[in-house]
A protein has these predicted regions:
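Catalytic machinery of carbohydrate-active enzymes
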Residues: 1-337
Length: 337
């Protein structure tokens, strides 16, 4: 009998990217499965990229929480409940383990699976599942998601992660530009300007054009000041997510602060350097088929020399355009749990 599976993982961009290999694993072990996915409306594109996803069901928690008891929000929640209950699922798998995802799970029909008390980020969430699974907390997010799906559906996963983004990568011609993401919404995420200049100088010396990503006007303004002395700079601001993915897939390499788009670049198989200043890469390292380096840690920005070393390596990898898979490097010590 065909399994009907509902994935609950609503946000954010990088976290949704981490789930894609688990969907590939499910599809491999249950090729006839019907896989639906509940996601925040702003990120609905990402699940739709995976060919094994049957239906994307959107929610609007980010809007609802601002006016939870308004007639509009109540009406939208009722409509969501009506839609999600059209199918009785064999397994409802909460891959987020937060109380906001528990709210979604409680609207569904089906056996509810999630992380156990010791594995969940918000431990109280584990009390609302029919079946709880233990997954080691301090390990990369892609592995955690693959393990959780395997435990819930009763299989063993193997092989490198498949992000199923071939629609962006198959037949693409790599262009002579680097995608750079030097800005962030929080100051504690930023890397020093003089260090950025050293990295950008190296890219320009190798003849690469610069394409600069920014999430909003403020970030674009900061980035514009940073790159004002460089020729051949193009700003990628306000582009649809699908177009950003195409830009990343055709880049020689990407270097950026820890963000969902940096993780997307790695998932697309491009050489990617991630700069971590306010978060730890222990749980969220860059993961992909190309060369990756996750540098720095929470409160410990990576040194200029460490970044330039890996950037030189990425330049060599991208120049060769090798088809060999190379493992990502994570420069961080695992904290005690």
């Amino acid at each position: 009998m065909t399994k009907k599976i509902l994935i609950v993982r609503s946000s954010s961009l990088g976290d949704l990217v981490f789930v894609l290999p688990a969907i590939s694993d499910i599809a491999k072990h249950y090729p006839g499965a019907t896989i639906d996915w509940v996601v925040e409306e702003a990120f609905a594109e990402i699940p739709s990229w995976h060919p094994a996803v049957n239906r994307v069901i959107t929610i609007s928690h980010r809007r609802w929480r601002k006016k939870w008891w308004s007639s509009e929000a109540r009406s939208e929640r009722a409509e969501f409940k009506k839609i999600v209950r059209q199918t009785k699922y064999d397994i409802v798998l909460d891959m987020q383990a937060l109380m906001k995802s528990v709210w979604v799970v409680r609207q569904t029909l089906g056996e509810r699976h999630g992380l156990d008390w010791k594995s969940a980020r918000e431990r109280i969430a584990s009390l609302f599942y029919n079946k709880r699974h233990h997954v080691e907390f301090w390990q990369p997010a892609v592995i955690r998601q693959r393990e959780l799906a395997a435990l819930a559906l009763g299989y063993s996963y193997e092989g490198p992660p498949d992000f199923a983004l071939q629609a962006f990568t198959d037949g693409v011609e790599i262009q002579n530009y680097a995608v750079v993401m030097p800005s962030a919404s929080r100051d504690d995420k930023l890397w020093p300007e003089e260090d950025w200049h050293a990295a950008l100088d190296l890219l320009v010396e190798h003849g690469l054009e610069l394409r600069v990503l920014a999430g909003n006007a403020k970030e674009a303004e900061r980035a514009a000041e940073l790159v004002k002395k460089y020729p051949n700079v193009e700003f990628l601001v306000g582009l649809p997510l699908k177009e950003v993915a195409h830009q990343l897939a055709a880049a020689r390499l990407m270097i950026g602060l820890d963000s969902g788009l940096t993780h997307l670049s790695a998932a697309l198989g491009r050489p990617t350097i991630g700069i971590y200043c306010a978060s730890t890469p222990v749980r969220t390292p860059l993961t992909g088929a190309g060369m990756t380096a996750s540098l720095g840690d929470r409160g410990v920005p990576p040194s200029r020399d460490a970044v330039l070393l890996k950037l030189n390596q990425a330049l060599g990898e991208s120049k060769e355009d090798s088809s060999e898979e190379t493992s990502g490097e994570q420069v961080a010590k695992q904290p005690e749990f």
